[in-house]
């Protein structure tokens, strides 16, 4: 905004108006008050006065003096040995000299060597001023454009008005000319009539003269009229030309003025941009700069050379006569290449007689310190000499910072540390940590991130994330799967599935002619068993799975390893939940079903109802047009067993089951356990190839050489072919049930893959735990008070431990939660007892026992150890213990109703109600609700209960009493008191 008075100008200069008035008075500008107007001439006079008074010269315009102050601390001990901190202040004064361009061109000026050190704040201020000036120039350009458009519109309107006035004037002149012509014609006619009415004496001569007279009288009128028309047309044309010329001149002047203003604005904008560019370059260059003083040089002939000799602020001018290479006198061998050096290559050399400019010095300081000279010049350091001549070339190139961000394709593995992720993106680790903090996670530089989180961070930082292929040794396992061995028919693997207590194991007992079911705890199967049976029709391998709901994972593993599923359904019980689950497992695996309707020997057996229920579940018998054979059997009498086996073998023939025999074995871990004498033991179902004793096997993260191999009867065996279950010993640890078993060529390769899998499992587990920390924290904040029941679960086999842990975790509620501190396979050891002591946990042993040392330690520390053989009992006991941890439920029981008959006001006590107990009884310790018009207005406790003048504990129905209520005196006759007691009721899950 332009300053029109002294006050506004003082506000622009950010100085008091009184000081400005004094300066104006000193400059000879008389202003009495702050409201006096101020012209541009007054400002110019003030500026000249200030320049003269402060001694401003042209030299000051070319010289800038900057002062920098730096404060530091040093610690020094005095004579007594006491340390003191001393403040040290260093003041640096640097002068920046701009060389005169004209004198540089003429070669008669030389600038002194100066050091320029520009403060960062000063540079930012300059850049801000340049940007502000550019914005002002842009705003002025817009205002000028708008003003020019307005002037053009006004000029067009004015020309339109002038043209309309000219047309109106012409029309008026034409009408006046017509009137004058008509008047002249009338006058001529009257004159002719007058001459015709004269005496007839001169008839002949007059008649002879009449025509000439009339012609003479008419000729001047016509001539005058034509002359007037010509003059009028000429005047109109002249006026038109004059108006057009004026309009053209006005338009040309306006265009020239606008062009001049635009050129001025463009020049100012270019100057502002150049200044901003110079400031940015100064900010990007090193702080200390030495400007080389140029030597006098003759005026160059070519413009390009003139521009080169002129020099800039950042690069001193090189004299035209000086060669860009080193002097030939000192380096003859380098003279020839220097002579043929192109100007572009010469520009890279140092512009001085053997000593580089400030840019080269800064580049040397930034670069890596080497023992040899890489500058290609004279100064070769201590290695310089004839032997090292010409070996090094100039390799100091100025690094150009990329102007656009580089988008990288980052391959993210399954787990990666923060430091590695930052290295892949070529950013600092602090940037990655900052992005993680924005996402709500606190991480360290060595923390593992899972793949999903890492890919989110990569995308947040503007790069492209790609899930990397695992660089693991398992890829070689897949490559070596191709085998040239001949595939031969193999026995079918049949899994027996169904609901608990439907007779699965009893059916297998009859087929095996063994008594397995009688030896199982509680009469239910809690392990997955594998048996192969030789029948007259061929060999069949059976897998017996548990039917209890807790063993879902076991049933899923059984369906995965099987070829045919026998679905056992009790004829007297029908389709149950685990029956439906077994059907779902079989359908998910694409395994054919053979339905065995068991217990047909019972009186209440109803096979038809079972068929209808199975049809509703999608299992249609063959007699109804389906593809599932239904066989009615009895595991007790053996009825229908032969038909069942025949249907199973028929299904196997249809499937044409084959597997290579002479090949390395591959299989599946059916069950695994930790035996105290044998170590880790795994039950394996061989699916292809032949497993021999002494082979090196890999099962998940466990590996080892097969030291012993037993069949399902416990007898040693040397080899096992396809579809044969065996029990092997010699693994490094207990493998997870369901893992794939592969025979490896050597133990070194097996160890490498196993260790890789262990590390990957650990990294993935840690990364997932870290990702879930924040969610768990927020969840716990919203939970409030939650009770935890810590448990340590030890089981005989892996599958049972897994099933028991899952069943116990399902008991958790919002108030009480099961916390599995540790779960493993094997007996209860001292380390388990120590862990239970530290975590205050209860140890649950499922088909396992504690050794003597563990029992003594548990008794000494008061650790509770519970033994179970049936999964029902373990789940029920934990459920009962959790019920005891629940907070009791509070219930209100109404004991009586009281009616207020009269109210007494007792000093220092308040209102006392004379009441009649109309229902139930009233106790001194009861709580009471005050009802008025059947609306509760107060709930509180009794303060006193009296009968006559005696305090009583209880008043029953039909008796009168006096009552007062704590903190309530607003008692009115007719109120009712509802007396109640609060009782606590134990809750259960």
Curated annotation (Swiss-Prot):
Report residue spans for region: G2: 523-527
Major localization class: cytoplasm
A GO molecular function annotation here is: GTPase activity
Q: Which Pfam families does the annotation name?
A: EF-G_D2 (PF22042), GTP_EFTU (PF00009), IF-2 (PF11987), IF2_assoc (PF08364), IF2_N (PF04760)
UniProt biased composition (Basic and acidic residues): 40-60, 122-178, 231-280
Start and end residues of each stretch annotated as G4: 598-601
tr-type G domain sequence ranges: 489-658
> Keywords assigned by UniProt?
Cytoplasm, GTP-binding, Initiation factor, Nucleotide-binding, Protein biosynthesis
Sequence positions that bind GTP: 498-505, 544-548, 598-601
According to the UniProt record, where is the region G1? 498-505
GO cellular component terms, alphabetically, are: cytosol
Among Gene3D superfamilies, the record links this protein to: P-loop containing nucleotide triphosphate hydrolases (3.40.50.300), Putative DNA-binding domain, N-terminal subdomain of bacterial translation initiation factor IF2 (3.30.56.50), Translation factors (2.40.30.10), Translation initiation factor IF- 2, domain 3 (3.40.50.10050)
Q: Where in the cell is it found?
A: Cytoplasm
Which region ranges are annotated with the description G5? Answer: 634-636
Compositionally biased region (Gly residues): 374-387
What's the stated role of this polypeptide? One of the essential components for the initiation of protein synthesis. Protects formylmethionyl-tRNA from spontaneous hydrolysis and promotes its binding to the 30S ribosomal subunits. Also involved in the hydrolysis of GTP during the formation of the 70S ribosomal complex.
Under the heading NCBIfam families, the entry gives: IF-2, small_GTP
> Which protein is depicted?
Translation initiation factor IF-2
The record lists the organism as Paraburkholderia xenovorans (strain LB400)
């Amino acid at each position: 905004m332009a300053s029109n008075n002294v006050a506004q100008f003082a506000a622009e200069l950010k100085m008091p108006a009184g000081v400005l008035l004094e300066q104006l008075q000193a400059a000879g500008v008389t202003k009495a008050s702050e409201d006096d107007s101020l012209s541009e001439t007054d400002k110019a006079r003030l500026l000249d006065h200030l320049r003269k008074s402060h001694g401003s010269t042209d030299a000051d315009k070319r010289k800038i003096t900057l002062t920098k102050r730096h404060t530091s601390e040093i610690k020094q001990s005095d004579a007594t040995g006491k340390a003191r901190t001393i403040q040290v202040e260093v003041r640096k004064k640097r002068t920046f000299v701009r060389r005169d361009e004209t004198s540089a061109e003429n070669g008669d000026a030389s600038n002194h060597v100066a050091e320029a050190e520009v403060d960062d704040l000063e540079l930012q201020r300059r850049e801000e001023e340049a940007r502000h000036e550019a914005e002002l120039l842009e705003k002025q350009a817009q205002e000028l454009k708008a003003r020019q458009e307005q002037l053009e519109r006004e000029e067009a309107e004015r020309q339109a008005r002038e043209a309309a006035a000219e047309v109106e004037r012409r029309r008026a002149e034409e009408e006046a000319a017509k009137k004058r012509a008509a008047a002249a014609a009338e006058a001529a006619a009257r004159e002719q009539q007058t001459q015709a009415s004269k005496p007839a004496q001169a008839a002949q001569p007059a008649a002879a003269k009449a025509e000439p007279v009339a012609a003479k009288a008419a000729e001047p009128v016509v001539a005058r009229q034509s002359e007037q028309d010509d003059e009028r047309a000429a005047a109109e044309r002249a006026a038109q030309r004059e108006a057009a010329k004026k309009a053209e001149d006005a338009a040309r002047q306006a265009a020239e003025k606008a062009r001049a203003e635009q050129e001025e604005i463009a020049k100012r904008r270019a100057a502002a941009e150049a200044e901003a560019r110079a400031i940015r370059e100064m900010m990007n260059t090193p702080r200390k700069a030495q400007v080389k003083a140029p030597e006098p040089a003759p005026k160059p002939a070519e413009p390009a050379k003139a521009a080169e000799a002129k020099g800039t602020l950042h690069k001193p001018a090189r004299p035209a006569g000086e060669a860009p290479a080193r002097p030939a006198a000192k380096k003859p061998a380098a003279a020839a290449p220097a002579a043929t050096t192109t100007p572009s290559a010469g520009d890279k050399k140092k512009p001085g007689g053997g000593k580089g400019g400030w840019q080269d010095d800064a580049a040397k300081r930034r670069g890596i310190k080497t023992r040899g000279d890489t500058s290609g010049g004279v100064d070769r350091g201590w290695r310089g000499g004839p032997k090292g001549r010409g070996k090094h070339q100039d390799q100091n190139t100025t690094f150009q910072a990329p102007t656009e961000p580089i988008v990288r394709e980052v391959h993210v593995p399954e787990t990666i540390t923060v430091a590695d992720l930052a290295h892949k993106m070529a950013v600092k680790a602090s940037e990655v940590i900052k992005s993680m903090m924005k996402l709500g996670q606190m991480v360290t530089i060595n923390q593992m991130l899972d793949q999903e989180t890492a890919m989110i961070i990569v995308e947040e930082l503007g790069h492209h994330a790609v899930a990397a292929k695992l660089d693991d040794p398992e890829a070689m396992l897949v490559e070596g799967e191709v085998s040239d061995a001949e595939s031969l028919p193999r026995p079918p693997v049949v899994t027996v599935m169904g609901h608990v207590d439907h007779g699965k194991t009893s059916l297998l007992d009859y087929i095996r002619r063994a008594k397995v079911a009688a030896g199982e705890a509680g009469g239910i199967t809690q392990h997955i068993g594998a048996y192969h049976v030789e029948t007259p029709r061929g060999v069949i391998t059976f897998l017996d799975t548990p039917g209890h709901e807790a063993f879902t994972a076991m049933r899923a593993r059984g369906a995965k390893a099987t070829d045919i599923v026998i679905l056992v359904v009790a004829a007297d019980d029908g389709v149950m939940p685990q029956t439906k689950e077994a059907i779902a497992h079989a359908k998910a695996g694409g395994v054919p079903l053979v339905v065995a309707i068991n217990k047909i020997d019972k009186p209440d057996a109803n096979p038809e109802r079972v068929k209808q229920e199975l049809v509703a579940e999608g299992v249609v018998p063959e007699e109804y047009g389906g593809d599932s054979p239904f066989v009615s059997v009895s595991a007790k009498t053996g009825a229908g067993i032969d038909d069942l086996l025949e249907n199973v073998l028929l299904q196997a023939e249809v499937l044409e089951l084959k597997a290579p025999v002479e090949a390395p074995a591959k299989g599946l871990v059916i069950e695994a356990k930790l035996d105290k004498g044998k170590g880790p033991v795994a039950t394996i179902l061989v699916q292809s190839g032949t497993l021999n004793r002494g082979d090196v096997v890999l099962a998940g993260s466990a590996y080892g050489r097969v030291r012993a191999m037993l069949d399902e009867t416990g007898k040693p065996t040397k080899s096992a072919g396809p579809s044969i279950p065996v029990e092997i010993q010699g693994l490094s640890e207990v493998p997870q049930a369901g893992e794939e078993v592969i025979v490896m060529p050597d133990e070194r390769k097996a160890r490498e893959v196993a260790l890789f899998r262990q590390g990957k499992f650990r990294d993935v587990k840690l990364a997932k735990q870290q990702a879930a920390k924040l969610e768990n924290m927020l969840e716990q904040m919203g939970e409030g008070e939650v009770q935890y029941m810590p448990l340590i679960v030890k089981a005989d086999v892996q599958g049972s431990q897994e099933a028991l842990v899952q069943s116990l975790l399902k008991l958790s509620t919002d108030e009480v939660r099961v916390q599995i501190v540790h779960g493993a396979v094997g007996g209860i050891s001292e380390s388990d007892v120590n862990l239970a002591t530290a975590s205050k946990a209860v140890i649950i042993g499922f088909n396992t026992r504690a050794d003597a040392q563990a029992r003594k330690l548990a008794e000494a520390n008061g650790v509770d150890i519970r033994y179970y053989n049936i999964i029902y009992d373990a789940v029920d006991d934990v459920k009962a213990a959790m019920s005891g941890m629940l907070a009791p439920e509070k219930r209100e029981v109404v004991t009586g109703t009281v009616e207020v008959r009269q109210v007494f006001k007792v000093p220092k006590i308040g209102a006392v109600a004379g009441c009649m107990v109309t229902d139930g009884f009233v106790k001194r310790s009861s709580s009471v609700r005050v009802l008025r018009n059947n609306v509760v207005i107060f709930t509180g406790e009794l303060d006193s209960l009296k009968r006559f003048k005696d305090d009583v504990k209880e008043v029953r129905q039909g008796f009168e009493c006096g009552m007062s209520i704590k903190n309530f005196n607003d008692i009115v006759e007719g109120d009712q008191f509802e007396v109640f007691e609060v009782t606590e009721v134990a809750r259960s899950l």
